Amino acid sequence: MDQKLSELVEELTTSGEPQLNPEKMKQLKKICKSSEEQLGHAYHLLMAQLSQEHAEIRLSAFQVLDQLFARSHQFRTLVVSNFQEFLELTLGTDHERPLPPPREVAQRLRQAATQAIRGWNEKYGAAYKKLALGFHFLKHSKQVDFQDVDARTVAERKRAEERQKRLDRIYKERSEWAAREMEEMSTEIRGCLTELESCFRLLLPFDLDLAPGAAWCPVPEKGDRDEEQPCCSKSLAACAHHPGAMDAGGPPSEDEDRDPDGFVRRHGLGSRQYTLDVELSSDSLRVRENEDNSAVIRAARDALRLIQNKLLPAACSWVQLFTRAGTYGGHLEGAIHLKAELEAALKRSRELDIVPEEGRSGETAAPGDEDEDEDDFVEVPEKEGYEACVPEHLRPECGEQRHGPGRGLEEGLAAPGSQARKRPGSDMEAFDPTSAAAQQQWPRPHGPPASPPSPRAPLAPEQAAWRAAEQARAPVVPFGVDLCYWGQEELMAGKILKCDSEHRFWKPCEVDAEVESASVSEALRSRRITFAGQFEPVQHRCRAPRPDGQLCARQDRLKCPFHGKIIPRDDAGRPLNAEDRAREQRQQLQRPAGRPDWQDPEFLRDVEAATGVDLGSSRPGGKGKGKRRKHSGLTDLKRQADTARARIAKKVFAKAAVQRVVTAMNQMDEKKHEKFANQFNYALN
């Protein structure tokens, strides 16, 4: 019976479920009813489970204890007799012994214990004095608020209050700053909205909301119609001048007011008893940009860009700050009103197809901008027949003196007097990049022109064939230090400055001392070439017997990854050497039954060393045979939290990843050593 009771308590408390199993709980109650001894044993088992450092075990144990507390007077007496320890294990009243993880389950345990103790006090407090004293101690000494749903302790409530006060102070400061900013920017917002509304009225001179059919164009009076009207627009007029234009779209006159029937007939209306709503499509409201309205559209786009990038985000942030603060009612209403007006302006701009986008195609440049661009850069056609450099045969005609590379001082003195005379200002012309003298100097090198290479004499056919054969047979090696110092008898050795004194400020003069190194000199004269040998294909096979009765056909050079070292075997797969046969017999005797060949510990260790993956060779049970968890339903406290940092660390610090990094760093060191091996300071270290 005791064994059955222990198993039931362990299964109930280590299941990890939020609710207890009703069937097992019924069996536990039945055993506890049998005798007081079993009830006391159950109490000690539950208190032992409450002492476990796992919040899920404590929560399940408390749920079992709560049900038994409500059914047995003897059990209530046992719990109340050790009530202080019970409070420490369920409520965490001792700050030196806090509730164990997981944190969420510990919070649920505290809430459940608080509600249960309050119910116990209301129901059994009069009969159990120690229970009433414990409730009074929690309420007045430990400051436990039994009305608090979260069942927080005094320290937790103080921390929450301090956090809330700090947030309120931050929100208040931000709200005051937002109120000052809104007062400063209100004028700018109103001005921007007024400017944008004026642009909309200039582009669309009627209001669609008030009178959908009131779009009329002002037409000149009849007396002025015959006169010529000045017009500077290159676009078509908005309203065509035709004989019926005055009657169809002109402003209402006094005759129409006196004759309402004529007004109805002229407009095609049957009567005045109904109204007509004209719906305009969005395509008909799009503003087309031309030369007349380009400046207005550009101003509207600038205002819309300002609203979209600065004013509307500021208004949204004001609304958010005032909403969080909750104490700036008037400012909140003003911010909401400004936000609504800005959003309405953006909506109307989208209806008119005026979008504040950068580099919009189709923008017509203003005339002033075109003039400025033309003033800055003027395209000049290139002069016909222009040559940047004067040819050699035309330089005497241009008055320039031609000096050959072999002419000396005598020839220069023997020149005619007209050419020997030096013109005034010729030195200044040489520095002027636009002068002919400077153009003569800059394309030519400072030294004498190099003579063209002399053509090589053609070789005889026999010599050419021999030379081609020798070139084909000669090895091609990359250029190195040995080729750089090829044929030099004396090499420049490295110099090291030696200073014998180590005083801080009194020093002797530095003396250059030449240190010769035999290894450096040898490296400068010779080259090390690695000879890998000639590839020889593998002719033999593994020929080890496989479980299916066939022989292994792998052609590895030294060692088979499945059967180990390759040894000579006969056609049946038996080793030819007696030592190999004896060794295989010993391995078969030592191999446990039921384990395949690929789980051999020696083979697994070789594979682990090659791949860097743990295959379980160090464990006694092989791969996947590690120690299993005793209670799989509980949360594993030793498991690392599944966070982004943990996942990245698992990938970065994996054994295979570390091995790859080590290999790459070793290769970098080898390349660096090969690159700087011929330098004396690296060679001497």
UniProtKB/Swiss-Prot annotation:
| A single MF term (Gene Ontology) | RNA polymerase II complex binding
Question: Which intervals hold the zinc fingers (UVSSA-type)?
Answer: 539-566
Location of this chain's protein in the cell: Chromosome
Gene Ontology biological-process annotations:
protein ubiquitination; response to UV; transcription-coupled nucleotide-excision repair
Q: Describe the processing and modification events after translation.
A: Monoubiquitinated at Lys-383 in response to transcription stress; this promotes efficient transfer of TFIIH to stalled RNA polymerase II.
| Coiled-coil segments on the chain, per record | 153-198
Question: Has keyword DNA repair?
Answer: yes
Q: Locate the compositionally biased regions of type Pro residues.
A: 445-458
Q: Looking at the record, which segments are called Disordered? A: 243-267, 353-466, 563-636
One GO cellular component term: chromosome
Q: Where is the composition biased (Basic and acidic residues)?
A: 380-403, 567-586
Q: Which UniProt keywords apply?
A: Chromosome, Coiled coil, DNA damage, DNA repair, Isopeptide bond, Metal-binding, Phosphoprotein, Ubl conjugation, Zinc, Zinc-finger
Which PANTHER family does the record cross-reference, listed alphabetically?
UV-STIMULATED SCAFFOLD PROTEIN A (PTHR28670:SF1)
Q: Which family does it belong to?
A: Belongs to the UVSSA family.
User: Quaternary structure per UniProt?
Assistant: Interacts with the elongating form of RNA polymerase II (RNA pol IIo) during transcription stress. Interacts with the TFIIH complex during transcription stress. Interacts with ERCC6. Interacts with ERCC8. Interacts with USP7.
From the Swiss-Prot or TrEMBL record, give the protein name: UV-stimulated scaffold protein A
Q: Please name the source species.
A: Bos taurus
